[in-house]
């Protein structure tokens, strides 16, 4: 049986970030401040979803939601959304310690940033030798928290032709998605996206910046009722 994944070529526009008031706590593993949204789950999730979900778009997420519900995965409601994502975030931070993967939180959405030096060989969609171990840890946590949509986005720097970079980012996102599904993640939960070179997180004028832009991001969005 072949599984179908949503894989889209996209053009991003700048998003307006909303300032949200929430309780902040110090993460025991990194010392950084993070948002604890258990008490404000629904309100924060709606606002942040517009930002974190900008890559795949609401249509793709709605299709995943319907597919997940059809597969018997129930949604979250109210303050339970924030509490659920709090626990998932904590487990991911523990699992990703020492891997080079950063875990960030915005409202009810979690993003894993996987830098290019641990993900893929240069110019290739073949996994680097150390990357499967990282993905195994990610899959272990994601299987525990199945009430989340998983958006896998590949990103590149601007070296070479834009068309090539777009295709490479799509292949890399698809490779990661396939690997996670092979480890037991339900395909109904996944969205595979190639962002190409159009969403940099650093300047492409330096090697350090280009290295930062070569990455895979996993965005985890709660499945809400």
Where are these regions (language model features)?
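Bacterial N-terminal signal peptides that target proteins for export
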Residues: 1-11
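Periplasmic OmpA-like peptidoglycan-binding domain that tethers envelope proteins to the cell wall
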Residues: 155-225
């Amino acid at each position: 049986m072949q599984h179908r994944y949503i894989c889209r070529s996209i053009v991003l526009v700048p998003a307006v970030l909303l300032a949200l008031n929430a309780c902040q706590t110090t993460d025991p593993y990194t010392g950084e401040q993070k948002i604890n949204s258990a008490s404000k789950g629904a309100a924060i999730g709606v606002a942040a979803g517009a930002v974190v979900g900008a890559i795949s778009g609401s249509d793709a997420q709605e299709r995943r939601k319907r597919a997940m519900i059809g597969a018997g995965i129930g949604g979250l409601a109210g303050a339970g959304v924030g509490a659920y994502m709090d626990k998932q975030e904590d487990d991911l931070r523990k699992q990703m310690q020492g891997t080079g993967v950063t875990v960030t939180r915005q409202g009810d959405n979690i993003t894993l940033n996987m830098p290019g030096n641990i993900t893929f060989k240069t110019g290739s969609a073949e996994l680097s030798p150390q990357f499967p171990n990282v993905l195994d840890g990610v899959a272990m946590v994601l299987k525990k928290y199945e009430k989340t949509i998983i958006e896998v986005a590949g990103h590149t720097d601007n070296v070479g032709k834009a068309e090539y970079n777009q295709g490479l980012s799509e292949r890399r996102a698809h490779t990661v998605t396939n690997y996670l599904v092979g480890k037991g993640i339900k395909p109904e939960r996944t969205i595979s996206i190639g962002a190409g070179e159009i969403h940099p997180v650093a300047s492409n004028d330096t090697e350090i910046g280009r290295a930062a832009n070569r990455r895979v991001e996993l965005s985890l969005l709660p499945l809400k009722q």
